[in-house]
Curated annotation (Swiss-Prot):
Phosphorylation activates in vitro RNA binding. The modification Phosphothreonine is found at residue 226. Residues 35-99 form the CSD domain. InterPro entries: Cold_shock_domain (IPR050181), CSD (IPR011129), CSD_CS (IPR019844), CSP_DNA-bd (IPR002059), NA-bd_OB-fold (IPR012340). It is found in: Nucleus. SMART domains: CSP. SUPFAM superfamilies: Nucleic acid-binding proteins. It comes from Aplysia californica (California sea hare). Binds RNA in vitro. Residues 159-171 have a biased composition (Low complexity). PANTHER family: COLD SHOCK DOMAIN CONTAINING PROTEINS. This is Y-box factor homolog. Residues 1-26, 124-178, 224-253 are annotated as: Disordered. The lineage of its organism: Eukaryota, Metazoa, Spiralia, Lophotrochozoa, Mollusca. Signal peptide: none annotated.
Amino acid sequence: MADTEKQPEVEENQPDQEQNEEQKEKKIIASQVSGTVKWFNVKSGYGFINRDDTKEDVFVHQTAIVKNNPRKYLRSVGDGEKVEFDVVEGEKGNEAANVTGPEGSNVQGSKYAADRRRFRRGGWYPRFRGGGRGGRPRQDMDDGAPDFMPSPRGRGRGRPYYQNRRYFGPPRRGGGRQYLEGEGEYQLQRDQGFRGARRPFYRPLLRTTSQGLLRRWLLRLPRRTTQGRTSQARRRERPWGLPQRQRPKPRQR
């Protein structure tokens, strides 16, 4: 019989001892203590609160804030803000826990803390022609919307609707786009006396061929007459009328 091979046992990575150890519950010294924030650093995430009863400065960390301002991205308390908290015994002294606003409300937060971004969830944007991409209409839209609003099709968001998105020129006087119910399109309606934007002038491109360059060069040259010239001078000229290049005379020493 063949010897059975022993498979090595896979040792699982054990978590750190610090994570396995249960965190000891901190001893509560006082509860629902009111105080004023002395200072708080948003970047570092900690600060100090001055108790109203004993005038003692208590350390506070951002993780101790229970009810944060929902508009703020990070947990924080503002300088000079009135808060309520519990005093617990920490490793290096007294600390604040369960920090809330007055009477258990949300804290205002620091003015240096970043606000949350406001995303538009759902909804659709009407387009110029047709519905295109879009979702369900919003509930906060007025019921008295015009009948020619494009109906949404598909999923996702559509492009924003601009009435005069392709117009470049002076401001209009009473002009706009008029919807044609029969054709389902928009027609540009202009006021009387409005001429519209001026059409741009495009200069034609010049030819870069040798024939075009030669023609341009000949047009710039003055007209030459052959009267009074000898045959020897005529031979020096090129067949198309350009003079032969003259070499510079050597300097006399």
